[in-house]
Amino acid sequence: MQGNLTALLITAIIVLTVVCIGFLAGRDKSSRTSVEEWSVGGRRFGGLLVWFLVGADLYTAYTFLGLTSTAFTGGSVAFFAIPYSVLAYFIAYFFLPKLWKVAKIHKLTTLADYARERFNSKLLASLVAIVGVLMLIPYICLQLSGIQDTLQVAGTGYINVKFVVIISFILVALYTFFSGIKGPTYTAIIKDILVWVIMLFMVVSLPLIHFNGWTPMIDTLVKEAPQMLTIPSEGPKGIPWFITASIVSALALFMWAHAATGVFTAKSADAVRKNSMFLPLYNIVLILVIFLGFIAFLVLPEDTNPRLALLHLIQTSYGGVAQGFAYATIALASLIPCSIMAIGASNLFANNLYRDLIHPNVSQSKLTLVTRSMVFVVIGLALLFGMLFPTALVTLQLLGVSGMVQIFPAIAVSLFWKNQTKEATVIGLLAGLAVTFIVYITQSAHGIYEGFWGLAANMIAVVILNPLFVKNAGSNPVIEGLFGKKQDANPNQKGA
């Protein structure tokens, strides 16, 4: 279907305006003086800025397009995103403020930094960093996929989609390199306001356009597709999958490097705590998005590509102006999270692989430059991977959730378990990753989310093996800050 020139022009104007704001956000040279300034804004962001930043970070184009696609094909299974995010914020309320305090005191900018200092182990920090980077690349690729799909629908017949996508991501890489976290933070405000306005507009107008209201729409859905409103009791995505997927996704949410980056920008633990209370408001948007998937199921032809369901629904329902604002919102929901993810991945690579393993005596100025420069490598890899393996992206991202949750014991559990040892934690992490991938490859999940099997193996290994190594456990400033000083501890003990 031919694109709409008016919609394409509006999309381009909004996106380019936001990119310019991203560059302007970094006009103050202080944003590039250190890794801490560039990646977490010197930890000076108030509660409202953090709310916009983390919201932009976690609710991406993949959230909107992916949830609509899931609702379009699987019905109510898509609602797993609601309990998982509510549960995630409930859990985060208890551990994120403690983690923020440790990061603030010891000037940590990544979760791998915390693992290194908490356990005196560069090995564990490197594992956390490797998992974080490898799992994040496909997630960045999905943002590429989101803007590519948007431009494909909006610009068919007018532009070379791949060329424009590449240019868009180069611009994002440039403003991220230049402005650091300040770029996506200030542009996130625009993106999030657009998300709320456009989604509310769509959820009110679409039922009126196609069914004369919500009640007739629900009645039509009940009559024509009642299976869309129930969760299967068994099968590969039955109730056990729904429950375990919600639990694993909740535990994994703040293990992602970009989520931790957003949290570490806060100016106080109280700001982090308040965000855990108010971030669930974004679930209102998620509920609306799922119902848009139901509307798409009723309105669009059966052979519609589920991935493009929301975009085609917009295309067939609105004129050029409304299409333009909707497409721009989805495009920004691709580009802005991509920037934050690139910062998170670059930080992990530069701090926890380059500095910790390759060049431990690197100067702060050079480390800052290396960290900033890695943005181009990360986004370049994501572009390359997305172009070469487009069909593997969703699978890899879903597997990424199962992989990321395996660092939960090393990060969140260790904030509360004083005698947790690095040896048991490393073995548990490796066991969890191995079990997750074996279950996935052999397709032996038995209706349970793959990451749940891995996390179970991980925790069992840590609990069983920890007593074997606890006598070797030392102390350090992080442990003393969390649990108080330990008598007879050897603070100079170093790990692998």
Swiss-Prot record:
Keywords from the named record: Cell membrane, Membrane, Transmembrane, Transmembrane helix, Transport
Gene3D superfamilies attached to this UniProt entry: Sodium/glucose cotransporter
UniProt record, GO biological process: transmembrane transport
GO CC aspect terms: plasma membrane
Residues that span the membrane, as ranges: 5-25, 45-65, 77-97, 127-147, 161-181, 193-213, 239-259, 278-298, 325-345, 374-394, 396-416, 424-444, 450-470
Membrane topology: Multi-pass membrane protein
UniProt-recorded Gene Ontology molecular function terms: transmembrane transporter activity
One Pfam family matching this protein: SSF
Highest taxon listed in the record's lineage: Bacteria
Induction: Negatively regulated by TnrA under nitrogen-limited conditions.
Cell compartment(s), UniProt: Cell membrane
Family: Belongs to the sodium:solute symporter (SSF) (TC 2.A.21) family.
PANTHER family, per the entry: MONOCARBOXYLIC ACID PERMEASE, SODIUM/PROLINE SYMPORTER-RELATED
Name recorded for this polypeptide: Uncharacterized symporter YodF
Species the sequence originates in: Bacillus subtilis (strain 168)
